[in-house]
Amino acid sequence: MLRPLEFVYRGLSKLRRWFLRRRFGGRQYAAPVIVIGNIAVGVSGKTPLLMALVMQLRLRGFKPGVVSHGYGGEHRGPPIIVDSEGAASIYGDKPLLIARQCACPVVVGANRDHAVRMLLANFDCNLVLSDDGLQHYAMPRTVEVAVVDGSRLFGNGYCLPAGPLRESIARLSTVDFVAINGPITDSAPEIL
């Protein structure tokens, strides 16, 4: 019953991606941006991957910073810097976890472009990682990493509202890396 709406949603998503990339595609930041996201709704393991990358990049001499939407936090205004001694109710639990565990600067804000600009203006970062920003096309990016839950994969393969996908499976062919989190189901090889 929702299948016809899925076609509308998928078409609007493609049009939105095309428009935002055309409008904002030429902009760059003073540091490269690595976006870690997914094409399905729900938990896929993005934050643990981001945290592992932050730690490895620091060992290799990089000075990473992180931007996040701050889902679950009360803050709804312009971007703010996460205080590692602050409360998850303000920033969201994942940004606070990243700030505490990785000891790196984290900025939360719904507008990721503004969050990146604030991060780079206030900290000596030479690399930015965006937690769950794959569909935030107004934010220029250098590298895209899509995380897929190996046990759930893509559900029924349909986009919202008929299925769990934010974008079609074909979107994975445009990202730089696909990371599979957890054991892969038997149907994965033919899909991937």
What are these regions (language model features)?
Residues M1-G11:
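Charged, amphipathic alpha-helical linker segments immediately N-terminal to NTP-binding catalytic cores
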Residues F7, P48-Q56, L97, A115:
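Generic beta-strand or strand-like secondary-structure segments
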Residues R17-S84:
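Walker A (P-loop) phosphate-binding motif
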Residues G70-G73, G77-L192:
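Phosphate/Mg2+-binding loops and adjacent switch elements
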